[in-house]
Amino acid sequence: MKRHGILNSQISKVLADLGHTDTIVIADCGLPIPAGVARIDLALELGTPSFVDVVRIVADDMAVEQVTLATEIKAANPVALEAVMKLDVPQDYVSHEAFKELTKQAKVIIRTGEATPYANVILHAGVIF
């Protein structure tokens, strides 16, 4: 059994397999998941686990080089935006429709129980050296 880091075996495997510039998505419970993109569904009930908690925990175990967010998060969800800003990496903003198109390229979408608008982020893998 692991002593530290993410205990979820699916998430641990995805993070270990990422290459530079690969992407994963952390999503609220309403984001559509494109056909062909792997899903790790953590949602237990509305709000659990939260977007903020999952972003914090995953980013703590991942080399994140950049994030992509929907522009709409700025006005609609300052709490989720603040959680992502704490990662202290460059941010790219696109429309929500463009964001959904970008999710088609993700290695995986991690679905949280979050039920607030635009609580979605694309994490771009960096390197550890």
From Swiss-Prot:
Annotated binding of substrate, by residue: D28, H96, Y118, A119, N120
Keywords associated with the record: Carbohydrate metabolism, Cytoplasm, Isomerase
Compartments where found: Cytoplasm
Active site (catalytic residues): H20
GO biological process, one term: D-ribose catabolic process
Keyword Lipid metabolism recorded: no
UniProt GO cellular component terms: cytosol
InterPro entries named in the record: D-ribose_pyranase, RbsD-like_sf, RbsD_FucU
GO MF: D-ribose pyranase activity; intramolecular lyase activity; monosaccharide binding
Catalytic activity entry: beta-D-ribopyranose = beta-D-ribofuranose
Enzyme Commission number: 5.4.99.62
Listed pathway(s): Carbohydrate metabolism; D-ribose degradation; D-ribose 5-phosphate from beta-D-ribopyranose: step 1/2
Top-level taxon in the UniProt lineage: Bacteria
Family classification: Belongs to the RbsD / FucU family. RbsD subfamily.
Reported function: Catalyzes the interconversion of beta-pyran and beta-furan forms of D-ribose.
HAMAP family in the record: D_rib_pyranase (MF_01661)
Known partners and oligomeric status: Homodecamer.
Name recorded for this polypeptide: D-ribose pyranase
Name of the encoding gene: rbsD
